Amino acid sequence: MQDSPKLTARQQQILDLIQSTIERTGAPPTRAEIATEFGFRSANAAEEHLQALARKGVIELLGGTSRGIRLKSDTLRSINESRLRGIGQQFSLPLSNMPPAQLTLPLVGRVAAGSPILAQQHIDQSYTFEAHMFSRKPDFLLKVRGMSMRDAGILDGDLIAVQRASEAKNGQIVVARLGDEVTVKRWRRSKSGIDLIPENPDFDIIHVPADSPDFALEGLAVGLIRNTMLM
C-alpha cells in the first residue's frame, strides 16, 4: 500500500473542508467558497491549492463545473481509517487487516405515483460498493437523468447514493418525488413551500406549494458514483 502523500498544513485544511462540505451538503465547495473560508483574495488562490492537491493524487478536478472536485477513493479510505483508528486499536485484529465493509444497494428505476420508492417493482438491479465511499450509510441508488445538477459535479448517467430522510436543511442536495417523477435538486424552504434548485442556469427552479399532495422528500444525497466506474 502506498504511503499517503505529504500535504502542507493549508492543503490539509482545504482537504478537510472539502470532506466536511460533502458530508454536510452532499456536494463539494466552490472555489469562491474555499477562498471565503480561508480569506484568500480571489478564487484563483483556491484553484492553485486544488491543483496542488490534484497533483498529489488526493482529489480529482472535473472540468466545466464550479463544484467539480472529487475525493479519490484512496483519500476516502485514508480519512475513514483515521477516524476509526482509535476504535480499531481496541481489537486484536489490526485495522489494516480488516476486510473493507461492503454495502449492496438497490438501484431504483422508474417510480409509480403513490407507491413506496423502494417497492420491489421499482428495483432495476443492485450494486455492491465499499462502505467507505459514502459520507453516511445510503439506503438506495438513483440514476441521474439530465444535466440539471451539472455545476454540483453531478452528471447524466451518474449514480446518486441516497439516505432515506423526511427532513432536509437548506442547501442540501436531496432526492424528491413529484407524482411519478423523481428529481435530484438542492433544497430550500420558502414561506410558501419548497424550492428545488438546479445547479445549471439552463434549468428553472421548481417551486412546490406547501400543501402539494404529490410531493415527497425521499432522501439526502450522501455519495456519488461516476458512470465510468460502472463500465
From Swiss-Prot:
Q: Which domain of life is it from?
A: Bacteria
**Matches recorded under InterPro entries:** LexA, LexA-like, LexA/Signal_pep-like_sf, LexA_DNA-bd_dom, LexA_repressor, Peptidase_S24_LexA, Peptidase_S24_S26A/B/C, WH-like_DNA-bd_sf
The chain's disulfide connectivity reads none
Q: Where is this site: Cleavage?
A: 113-114
Write out the GO biological process terms: DNA repair; DNA replication; negative regulation of DNA-templated transcription; proteolysis; SOS response
Could you tell me which residues form the DNA-binding region? 31-51
Catalysed reaction equations from the record? Hydrolysis of Ala-|-Gly bond in repressor LexA
Q: Where is the active site?
A: 148 (for autocatalytic cleavage activity), 185 (for autocatalytic cleavage activity)
Report the protein's function.
Answer: Represses a number of genes involved in the response to DNA damage (SOS response), including recA and lexA. In the presence of single-stranded DNA, RecA interacts with LexA causing an autocatalytic cleavage which disrupts the DNA-binding part of LexA, leading to derepression of the SOS regulon and eventually DNA repair.
> What family is this protein classified in?
Belongs to the peptidase S24 family.
The protein's name: LexA repressor
What organism is recorded for this protein?
Leptothrix cholodnii (strain ATCC 51168 / LMG 8142 / SP-6) (Leptothrix discophora (strain SP-6))
Cite the source lineage.
Bacteria, Pseudomonadati, Pseudomonadota, Betaproteobacteria, Burkholderiales
What gene name is given for the protein in this entry?
A: lexA
